[in-house]
Amino acid sequence: MRALLLAFQLLSVVAALTTVNCRLDLSPRQISRKDLLRTHLRLYQVGNFSGQPYSAKATLRDPEGRFRFEDLPVSHDENSTVYFQLVASSQDYNLKPNRVLIEVQGRGEGKEPTVRAFQNVFGREHFPSPEILYPEQLVELEAEPELVISYVHAAPMRNYIVSRRSGILDSGPLAGIFRSKYKMAAVVTIIALLLFPMLVEKFDPATVEAIKEQRLSQTREKYAAVGESNS
């Protein structure tokens, strides 16, 4: 009989299971398959706990960006509070909030536990209470019916391969010419002046012959005028 009573008492305080519903909001953009693959969501238990700590990863469930963490261990005891840390990251966006402290408090037998969320900051991931002023009190977020995570702006481009030696087009005199539109215009003009006679001779030989005859006649007239002045 005592064994049955002890078992009943243990069942009254044993951990129940609850779910935290969340949503990733990228509006006005639509969530694509790329966002599904490049967004990482993790929830783990912090604070005082017994046994194996809870840890889980979630993925976006639909194009609306909904995701959830299931089977969170909580207690029926009214004085029992369990804390979890939600970490959200993306390879394409800076998410806000990217760290959320989730508080699950039991309300007694037959009642759903109360879920609260607080915007956490870097360096406070393992503080198990939002009331610790280090360095400031955490801001409470709306957790019902779902916790919403949005984005600040697109993340900067990540250079996974960095060239140690730059080429001649990245540094040096040639790079300076290519970066300046005025220098480029001067170079193109000089090249055009050098190539123009050859192009004309190739595509219009008659015009080239006429130009040569005109220059030759001008030279003859010049020498003829010089000879008359000497005589």
UniProtKB/Swiss-Prot annotation:
GO biological process: protein transport
Primary residence: endoplasmic reticulum
Pfam families: SOP4
Residue ranges crossing the lipid bilayer per the database entry: 184-200
Coiled coil: none
Signal peptide bounds: 1-16
Compartment annotation: Endoplasmic reticulum membrane
Side of membrane Lumenal, spans: 17-183
Spans within the Cytoplasmic topological domain: 201-231
Role summary: Involved in the export of PMA1, possibly through the monitoring or assisting of PMA1 folding and acquisition of competence to enter vesicles.
Protein's UniProt name: Protein SOP4
